[in-house]
Regions:
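Alpha-helical transmembrane segments of multi-pass membrane proteins
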Residues: 1-208
């Protein structure tokens, strides 16, 4: 029921967004974008975190290949797409009362929300996998899970850095450095906490 409700929210938000683009309506576009943002917030805070805390991991579905993950990815991707398409139809600054919203700024914000959301979504699926019987079959599931987190975060940061340089955008590069720093700190403090200090220092220097 929770995932079904999420898809209903997504269809409604996408309908508002599509209508705003077709009508070249600034205010309807802002409402559609807000609806997408609220839907993404519901998915991140309630559908995943709250349900995980209350009922445990939903291991009856395959990691990555499930409707909950798909809903999250779709709603996250819809936000920057909505801003980009509406910016083409309404290229000037959008009026919200006395305030002006620049499409370029909104595009960057939507892109960063989407990127962080994807990072979170895959991390959540890693948690789902290691809570399942298959994940528990590892010799040390806890260590394997944290290693998987670190690998995914490092891959994500590398991709964001590449996007930042290829497209000459500062925001992806900044996000990449933040994620890299967090990954290095996690590797040093969590993944290698049982390793002797001298090897932790050497590994940290090499990773840096």
């Amino acid at each position: 029921p929770v995932t079904g409700a999420m898809w209903a929210w997504l269809v409604l938000a996408a309908g508002l967004a599509a209508t705003s683009i077709a009508a070249r309506s600034e205010w309807l576009g802002i409402i559609g974008g807000a609806a997408l943002l609220i839907s993404a917030g519901k998915w991140a805070l309630f559908d995943t975190i709250a349900m995980r805390v209350a009922y445990g991991a939903a291991t009856s579905v395959a990691p990555l290949l499930n409707w909950q993950f798909a809903a999250g990815i779709v709603v996250l991707a819809a936000m920057p797409v909505h801003v980009a398409l509406l910016a083409r139809r309404v290229p000037h600054a959008w009026q919200l009362g006395s305030a002006e919203l620049a499409p370029e700024v909104l595009g960057v914000v939507a892109g960063m929300i989407c990127s962080v959301g994807v990072l979170y979504a895959v991390s959540f699926e890693i948690d789902r996998y290691f809570a399942s019987p298959a994940g528990q079959g590892w010799q040390d599931p806890y260590q394997a899970m944290h290693t998987a987190y670190s690998v995914w975060w490092a891959v994500f940061a590398t991709v964001m850095m590449a996007i930042g340089f290829i497209r000459r955008r500062r925001a992806p590069r900044i996000l990449s450095m933040i994620v890299f720093a967090g990954t290095l700190a996690k590797v040093f403090l969590v993944d290698m906490r049982n390793v002797e200090a001298v090897y932790r220092i050497l590994s940290f220097m090499c990773l840096g």
